[in-house]
Regions:
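Flexible, glycine/charged-enriched surface loops at secondary-structure junctions
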Residues: 26, 84, 227-229
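Thiamine diphosphate
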Residues: 105, 109-222
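Short, small-residue-biased leader/transition segments that mark boundaries at the very start
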Residues: 1-2
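Glycine/aspartate-rich loop-and-adjacent alpha/beta segment that forms the canonical ThDP
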Residues: 209, 213-270
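N-terminal capping segment at the start of a domain
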Residues: 7-23, 171-173
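Short secondary-structure boundary/capping segments
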Residues: 76, 184, 244-248
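Cofactor-binding active-site loop characterized by glycine-rich and histidine/acidic residues
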Residues: 14-17, 29-160
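Glycine-rich beta-alpha junction loops
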Residues: 34, 64-65, 69, 173-174, ...
């Protein structure tokens, strides 16, 4: 499956699964659909066995986008595809937030914002101690959670320990539940902040497949001494025109007719 097709898969299945659940985080998923699609299009070192010890790890610090991750894990065969139809149902392993104890391919249970980078630091340090020289730990962050002080404690720790096997990706969509980051509390300049903590930083268009894949391929070896940060400039709700730049769809539910129309637009845009 091509890279763009994976991003479209994430969006289509997010709409379908939220229709099953009754509500969910459409626009937060849509802003990082290309980013998640890229990670599962050859960027991460993963295998058929989701428990392979030397695999890359992915921490969804913005755990409320798990509904977009599940179709990618099912596509890889980590769990049966019919699990998707049970999303958020009583007894289902697939909840609003990812559960590492119940879902193959999930590397850490997340949900409360601000914790993911600290977890990533611990995993990157553990990989070094175990001699997993090619293992990289990826952390997908939302921009508004950068207001959590724990993020910057982790950023300082990563630099101090020389964790060149850690890469943070910031989904900089500039919008959260309460409004834009400028209205609530600015987190800019994101790149300069990470650089001040000793990270290598690059900014790119988070909806440009070529830019994402090119930058991922250009990352320094995991044996390096500087952690990496990719600031991905994205649009909240990207892929469905009436959701773009609207906080209305941070969490919500589409009627069946609106859901069908959204899927048509996703397919047309590719």
């Amino acid at each position: 499956m091509l890279f763009r097709s994976r991003a479209a898969l994430v969006r289509r299945e997010t709409i379908r699964l939220i229709e099953i659940a009754g509500n969910g985080h459409y626009s937060s998923v849509f802003s990082c659909a290309e980013l998640m699609g890229a990670l599962y299009s050859g960027v991460m070192r993963i295998a058929e066995d989701p428990e392979w010890p030397e695999r890359d790890r992915l921490i969804l610090s913005k755990g409320h986008v798990a509904v977009g991750l599940y179709p990618l894990l099912a596509e890889r065969g980590y769990f049966p595809a019919d699990w998707l139809d049970s999303y958020t149902r009583l007894g289902s392993p697939l909840g609003d937030h990812p559960d590492m104890r119940r879902i193959p391919g999930v590397d850490f249970s997340s949900g409360s914002l601000g914790h993911g980078l600290s977890i990533g630091v611990g995993m990157a340090k553990a990989a070094r101690l175990r001699g997993y020289d090619e293992t990289r730990v990826w952390v997908l962050l939302g921009d508004q959670e950068l207001n959590e002080g724990q993020i910057w404690e982790a950023a300082g720790s990563a630099s101090h320990f020389g964790l060149g096997n850690l890469c943070a990706i910031v989904d900089a969509n500039q919008m959260g539940l309460d409004g834009t980051t400028e209205e609530t509390m600015s987190v800019e300049p994101i790149g300069a902040r990470f650089a001040a903590f000793g990270w290598d930083v690059v900014e790119l268009d988070g909806h440009d497949p070529a830019a994402i894949l090119t930058q991922a391929a250009a990352l320094p070896a995991t044996t390096g001494a500087k952690p990496q940060c990719i600031v991905a400039r994205t649009v909240k709700g990207n892929g469905v025109s009436y959701m773009e730049l609207s906080r209305t769809w941070h969490i919500g539910w589409l009627s069946p007719d609106d859901a069908a129309a959204a899927v048509v637009e996703i397919d047309q845009r590719g």
